Amino acid sequence: MNNLEKWRFYLKDMQSPNSYINMGFYYMISCALQRRVYLNATKMPLFANQYIVLVGDAGLGKSMVIRHVTEFLKYHLLYDKRSLGVKTLPPGIPKRELTNKEKAEEMARENPEMFKEVMSLMGVDTSKMSFSKLKDRPDPLLIPVAANCTTYEALTRSLADSIRSIQPEMNGQTHMWVKNGIYSYSTACFSLSEVSSLFKKHHEDVIRFLHETYDCEEDYVYETKNQGIDRIKRVCVNLLGGSTFTFMNDAFSNRLLAEGFASRATFVCEDRPRFYKFAIPEFSEEQMACGVDILIHIKRLTTLFGQVSYTPEAYEYFRFYFEEVYPKILPGLPRALIDWNARMNIHVQKLAMAVHFGDSVEMTITLPSCQKAMNILEDLMTRMCDAVGATGKNPLADVGNRILKTLEKFGPKTKQEIWTDFVSDVRLVELEEVLEYLFATGKIKKIEGERLKSMRETNKLTDDIKERLQ
């Protein structure tokens, strides 16, 4: 099994849709790569960070995936002296020797008085040393995970405190980012069961921050009203959040979220779980072993640094699509996805890095990884309009989308049954207007017994794209 298959097996008893599980895995890989691995030249690097929002009704298993992703991201500590054999996980990573700094920190944490005595013998003044908060301070994470709900000020402060450094193997070469053999950067990932906790009203600064940090610029500078100037070096932010269609529609309709965020985020929309399950059993030894393999791979990824390249076949695949195929299909794309498609070349390359490094530590991306990334995004695009389609002013458009989702989820219904479901949202004359539009655009049709059936196709572009790319 490859690592994605191991992740699926690890979560095999979760009812979450496959797309949630898969994108949760790729988000985890992007978080592990942080701001260290990049495509393109060092002057205009493209990093693997992603903003991913799992959209669906309550009970689909969004939180299940996000919770397990967060547990994996939080496992490795910055100064990690554990093995993977603690408590529930079988042995996987051997313990290593502590550095002198780590030994001193451990002594100060566990026995402050002995630490003071040792420091005194070394001639250090310990009279003003305070250890009252040291025991309560959590060990820093190797991959920093930001707070669930935060103000802009707390966000920038958290990032400023999340500086990570590595000593990359340069093999006698130089790099403009590496100073005195060390590369430092500020990184954080948001794993939010409810993305609304971050995107509340009056959080315009947070939204603007996510817009500007998506490209992982060398410097992030923002002048606050009362706190002076915030400057964060080499920032990198990843986001995985859960949301409902209702919140997404309200957020876009009220301009709480705008096109800027919609073009940078990938929305994974589903309307039903993989299956229904009364209770989730304990993890088996085989599942736990798969979890260990993934944790080991994540640890390896945190040591990578440098420029990533494509094989000639992989580069030609993307070049042909975006220079020759994409301009021809662009006029037929849904209006709601125009902004997102403007950045599709960025989305697919970020995802291609996540797909490639999901199993490899080699710095060359191959054609299969590029093809897989393209296929994943094509599949997600078929439903993405459900999340970003509410940017207009017509409230009946939202009703039309919800009627389509109802017919897809529960099967054909009569007009009377639909009116019963939506009587609190529309009057009869408005419902007839919506149904007339759905008929005229071929999105629904009548079948036996005057029942209405959804005709929404999976993706009209997919077959055409695949034919052109062969």
Regions found by a protein language model. Give the residues of each.
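Phosphate-handling catalytic cores of nucleic-acid transaction enzymes
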Residues: M1-Q470
